[in-house]
């Protein structure tokens, strides 16, 4: 049976660990009380024994040897017993101070326990009430947002129905349309799509005839009036409320902003467009935000009211944001319920232990009643709000389908099966066997000797090294997942991975083992085909590349489809860095790419070799010595650093011009400069460029080491209680951190090999390059653990266990 202390430590929410009952410390206090009471009993027993030794022997024993048995012996025994009862009083008086001190010592520890338990109770109550108030306020805000959204959709649906009715009446008075015209859309009652079908898009404002545009303007004015009236009823203000229907401006005059002097008042100006605040996380949303700002500028200059249209995309994004916010709210409520139940159970268990040790039943009962009356134990507001959120989510977002609603609100964790473990072992054993077979065949064929086939080495090295580096990186990611799980680092929350997207360490090991098994099998088959003289044997690596590409883009729900699609989304965000909001998963993956530059170079050669059809004629020099190839290699060498620098610039603008992001971008710029200098040195190895390589690479390495240790890992803090580390550490053995710093320093200096000019053969040179690339990947996998550990501790320090979703409708000040 698992002890409660272990179960408790394994169940607490990592980000809220400091707010939970310190069960371990209370248990230590109980153990101290137990030890003190045991010492008391031993001291009392020793005092009694000492008192017995101080008693004089009974008179009967004194005289028994000289006088024998007498009928007066009972009388003497009574007298001796009476004198013995009187004499120990002096010894007891002598022992009283010690016993009293021991009793006071025990009372002191019991009092210390009760005071500590009371402090823990106050801490739990304070945290619970704060979180409860925050979640209740968030719930009220979300209900208000949902009410606003419902009003907007209702108004738009009413106007869409009126427009459809007018169109139907107009069509009855007009000749029938030609057969090529599209039929009218059908109404989808519960889907909600029809509610948004009548909204105009920015492009539609300039379409159609003049009469149609005037009709759209007047209709847009009416829609805008009703939408903003509904939103104002819900307490939302707008930018540009200077122009009202009565034509009065801020200064009280009756002229509008565009009003002339004579005839009849100012031009009617509506308030600015409905400000649905959608974060510009993608190019589409960014373009929509730019369009909205342009519309605001035009509105202030007296543009037509058609610019006040609410767009369908904005409503859809607003609805999605509100749905995600409800899911995050429900997640927070579930965590707070878990926080409450675990603390109640912890107090119950620890008080039972205290009663057994101290026998303070009355004090324990009083404290138990205090715990029961505490807000975290007695309040039912969280339970009520959770039930309300379930009903609201089911009604508004899943069409009253409770099963679908629970899939969103309570996503089920995938069950671990032993089949994955079995497949990992199977593929690993197969890989080892095939690798031994390949090593024997390669040795017999002599392909790795100096007199071997250089073309085979040039072709096979690039293609299969690419897969080997990918497999190694996935394997190290699996090691990271294993360590993060054991140390309770909430990596899925940090990366914002859903339950069906996140991999386990077994999944990563399975992917790595299957890739390597397939690669080595292809190596063995390729070697057999070459020795047999089969034509187009070099097409096998291309077939392997085509197979892997097909698996990556496979649309069927096999081979971890959700994870593959998530990977492709992250890669899209990296490639188009300035146009997408930079999330933790995006820049973490971009950092991985900076360690995979050799992999990108291998991909470049492979694409050139097979797309140009070189495997038919074997002129691999086409893809290694061409001028365009060299220029492309130069671009690829610093492309990951360029993407990462763009991400830093995007974060600099988004996070209020944080200077740290500019400094981080400078780190990647220095790496690009060092890569460019090394590339130039490889082309023209002169003494001048040797010194330039040493200077640029040394500067970039110092910059990177500082950022690794201080910013990414949080080390080198001179005021830390852990010397030259940080205050909070997850691993208990501090020497591991010092060794890791030295290892990171050594692996960061791998670039020194490029200036040593070691004279070795072509085969050995290829193997050395592969080894250095592997060491860089190992360094990155080693870096990953401490980077996420530091991020996790930052979340713990801020009690951040639930993501914050920005709300679309926000209150804005008037101009």
UniProtKB/Swiss-Prot annotation:
Protein's recorded name: Phosphate transporter PHO1-2
Compositional bias of kind Gly residues: 255-266
GO CC field: plasma membrane; trans-Golgi network
Alphabetical list of Pfam families matching this protein: EXS (PF03124), SPX (PF03105)
PROSITE patterns (alphabetical): EXS (PS51380), SPX (PS51382)
Record field: compositional bias (Low complexity): 183-201
Compositional bias annotation for Polar residues: 202-213
Record bears the keyword Cell division: no
Residue intervals of the EXS domain: 624-815
Tissue distribution of the protein: Specifically expressed in roots.
Record's keyword terms, sorted: Cell membrane, Membrane, Phosphate transport, Transmembrane, Transmembrane helix, Transport
Subcellular location per the Swiss-Prot or TrEMBL entry: Cell membrane
BP terms from Gene Ontology: cellular response to phosphate starvation; intracellular phosphate ion homeostasis; phosphate ion transport; polyphosphate biosynthetic process
Biased composition regions of type Basic and acidic residues, renumbered to the chain: 97-108, 243-254
Residues on Cytoplasmic side: 1-421, 480-508, 560-686, 752-815
């Amino acid at each position: 049976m698992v002890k409660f202390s272990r179960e408790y430590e394994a169940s607490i929410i990592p980000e809220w660990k400091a707010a939970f009952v310190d069960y371990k410390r209370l248990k230590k206090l109980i153990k101290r009380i137990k030890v003190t009471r045991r010492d008391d009993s031993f001291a009392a027993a020793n005092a009694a024994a000492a008192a017995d030794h101080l008693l004089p022997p009974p008179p009967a024993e004194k005289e028994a040897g000289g006088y024998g048995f007498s009928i007066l012996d009972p009388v003497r025994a009574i007298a001796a017993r009476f004198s013995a009862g009187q004499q120990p009083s002096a010894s007891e008086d002598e022992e009283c101070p010690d016993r009293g001190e021991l009793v006071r010592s025990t009372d002191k520890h019991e009092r210390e326990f009760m005071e500590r338990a009371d402090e823990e109770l106050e801490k739990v109550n304070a945290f619970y009430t704060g979180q409860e108030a925050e979640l209740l306020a968030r719930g009220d805000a979300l209900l208000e947002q949902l009410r606003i959204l419902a009003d907007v959709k209702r108004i738009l649906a009413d106007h869409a129905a009126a427009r459809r009715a007018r169109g139907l009446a107009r069509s009855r008075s007009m000749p029938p349309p030609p057969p090529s015209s599209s039929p009218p859309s059908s109404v989808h009652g519960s889907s909600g799509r029809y509610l948004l079908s009548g909204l105009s898009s920015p492009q539609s404002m300039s379409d159609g005839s003049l009469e149609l545009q005037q009709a759209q303007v007047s209709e847009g004015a009416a829609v805008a009036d009703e939408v903003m009236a509904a939103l104002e009823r819900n307490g939302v203000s707008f930018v540009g409320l200077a122009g009202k229907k009565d034509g009065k401006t801020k200064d009280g005059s009756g002229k509008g902003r565009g009003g002339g002097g004579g005839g009849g008042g100012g031009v009617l100006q509506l308030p600015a467009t409905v400000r649905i605040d959608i974060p510009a996380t993608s190019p589409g949303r960014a373009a929509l935000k730019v369009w909205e700002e342009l519309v605001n500028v035009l509105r202030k200059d007296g543009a037509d009211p058609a610019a006040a249209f609410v767009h369908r995309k904005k409503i859809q994004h607003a609805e999605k944001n509100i749905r995600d916010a409800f899911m995050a709210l429900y997640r927070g409520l579930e965590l707070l319920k878990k926080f409450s139940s675990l603390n109640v159970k912890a107090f119950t268990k620890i008080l039972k232990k205290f009663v057994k040790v101290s026998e303070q039943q009355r004090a324990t009962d009083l404290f138990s009643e205090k715990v029961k009356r505490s807000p975290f134990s007695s309040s039912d507001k969280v339970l009520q709000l959770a039930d309300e959120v379930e009903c609201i989510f089911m009604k508004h977002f899943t069409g009253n389908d409770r099963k679908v609603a629970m899939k969103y609100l309570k996503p089920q964790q995938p069950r671990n099966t032993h089949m994955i473990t079995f497949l990992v072992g199977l593929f690993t054993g197969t890989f080892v066997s095939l690798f031994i077979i390949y090593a024997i065949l390669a040795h017999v064929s002599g392909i790795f000797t100096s007199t071997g086939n250089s073309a085979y080495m040039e072709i096979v090295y690039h293609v299969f090294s690419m897969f080997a580096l990918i497999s190694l990186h996935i394997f190290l990611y699996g090691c990271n997942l294993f360590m993060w799980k054991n140390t309770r680092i909430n990596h899925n929350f940090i990366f914002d991975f859903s339950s069906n997207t996140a991999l386990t360490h077994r999944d990563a090991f399975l992917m790595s083992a299957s890739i390597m098994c397939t690669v080595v099998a292809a190596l063995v088959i390729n070697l057999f085909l070459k020795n047999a003289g089969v034509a187009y044997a070099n097409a096998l690596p291309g077939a392997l590349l085509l197979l892997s590409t097909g698996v990556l883009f496979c649309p069927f729900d096999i081979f971890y489809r959700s994870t593959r699609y998530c990977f492709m989304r992250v890669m899209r965000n990296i490639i188009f860095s300035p146009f997408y909001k930079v999330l933790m998963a995006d820049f973490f993956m971009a950092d991985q790419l900076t360690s995979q530059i050799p992999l990108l170079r291998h991909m470049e050669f492979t694409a050139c070799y097979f797309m140009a059809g070189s495997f038919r004629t074997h002129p691999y020099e086409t893809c290694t010595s061409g001028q365009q190839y060299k220029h492309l290699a130069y671009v690829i060498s610093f492309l990951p650093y360029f993407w990462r620098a763009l991400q830093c610039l995007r974060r600099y603008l988004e996070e209020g011009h944080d200077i740290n992001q500019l400094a981080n971008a400078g780190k990647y710029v220095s790496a690009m400069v060092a890569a460019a200098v090394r590339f130039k040195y490889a082309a023209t190895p002169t003494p001048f460029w040797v010194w330039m390589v040493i200077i640029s690479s040394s500067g970039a390495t110092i910059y990177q080491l500082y950022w690794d240790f201080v910013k990414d890992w949080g080390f080198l803090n001179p005021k830390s209680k852990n010397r030259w580390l940080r205050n909070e550490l997850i691993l208990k053995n501090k020497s591991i951190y010092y060794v890791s710093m030295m290892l990171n320093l050594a692996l960061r200096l791998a670039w020194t090999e490029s200036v040593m000019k070691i004279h070795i053969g072509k085969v050995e040179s290829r193997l050395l390059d592969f080894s250095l690339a592997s060491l860089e990947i190992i360094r990155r996998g080693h870096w990953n653990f401490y980077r996420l550990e530091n991020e996790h501790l930052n979340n713990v320090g801020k009690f951040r266990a639930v993501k914050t979703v920005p709300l679309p409708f926000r209150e804005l000040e008037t101009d």
